[in-house]
Amino acid sequence: MKYGFGVDIGGTTIKIGLFSVDGNLMEKWEIPTNKTDNGKHILTEIADFINRIIESKDIEKSDVIGVGLGVPGPVNKNGYVSVCVNLGWNSINVEEEFHKISDLPVKVGNDANVAALGEMWQGAGKGYQDVLMVTLGTGVGGGCVLNGQIVSGIHGAGGEIGHMPVKDDEETPCNCGNHGCLEQYVSATGIVTQAKKMLENDERPSSLRDYDCLDAKHIYDEATKGDVVANELVDST
C-alpha cells in the first residue's frame, strides 16, 4: 500500500495527516508551531514527527510517495519562500531543506492554494474547475484555482489577500510591517487584538473580561450567547 502525508503549517499549530493515495484521510495529528529562533526548528520537528509515525506504523519509507507542505506565505514554483511573517522565515527553500532533513519526496505550496486544490479534488469544489478559497487562522489566506490551475502570480503571492490594506488610519503595524492589513481585523489573532482594544476603551460590561487568555473562539461563543461587545466585534469583521 502507498501513502502520502499532508502538512498544514500554521502560525499556532501544525496539522499532519496520513492519507491513502486516493485521498482518504487515515489519521491526523496536531503539534505546536515552534517559532523560536525565527522558526528554524519547524521543518526538523515536522520531519522527526513524520518519521516516528512511519516507524510506529511499520510503513516502509519506499511506500511513502511524498509529503505535501502548505506554507502560510508566497511560494515560488521551486519551493522557495522569500518571506513568511507568521513563521519568522526569510529566504528559505523549504522544498530542498525538508527533503534533506526527512529523506522523503516533498512538494511545497502556499497553504490556501493547496487547500483550494484539495477542495477541488475531494471537497466542496469537487466537480468544478474554478475554485476560490479563503483560510482563516493565525493569519488570512486566499487561494484561487482557474481552469484547474492555481493562480500563483508572478511572485507566488496571487492569493495573499491577508495583506491587502483595508484601513488607512491604522497605527498598529501588521506582522508584515504595513498598516491596516485585512489580517489585522479578521484573523483569529486579529479579532482578539481588536477585542482587547475595545475592552480597554469601552466601559460596558462584557463576559469577555472574564477570560484570562482570550481567544477567537471565546469571542464567537459569547456572541452567540448575546454579549453585546462580542457581537459588535463579530459584526465588524
Predicted regions and their residues:
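Glycine-rich phosphate-binding loop plus the immediately following alpha-helix
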Residues: 108-112, 166-203
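A mobile "lid/hinge" subdomain adjacent to the ATP/sugar-phosphate binding pocket shared
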Residues: 183-237
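Short glycine-aspartate micro-motif
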Residues: 2-8, 64-68, 131-135, 173-175
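Glycine-rich phosphate-binding loop of actin/hexokinase-like ATP-binding domains
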Residues: 126-185
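Short glycine-rich, Thr/Ser-proximal phosphate-binding strand/loop in the N-terminal lobe
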Residues: 3-48, 80-82, 156
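Residue-level signal for inorganic ion chemistry
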Residues: 16, 31, 69, 98, ...
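Short glycine-rich anion-binding loops that position phosphate/pyrophosphate groups of nucleotides
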Residues: 12, 72-74, 137-139
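Glycine-rich phosphate-binding loop and adjoining helix at the ATP-binding site
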Residues: 39-48, 55, 62-67, 73-132
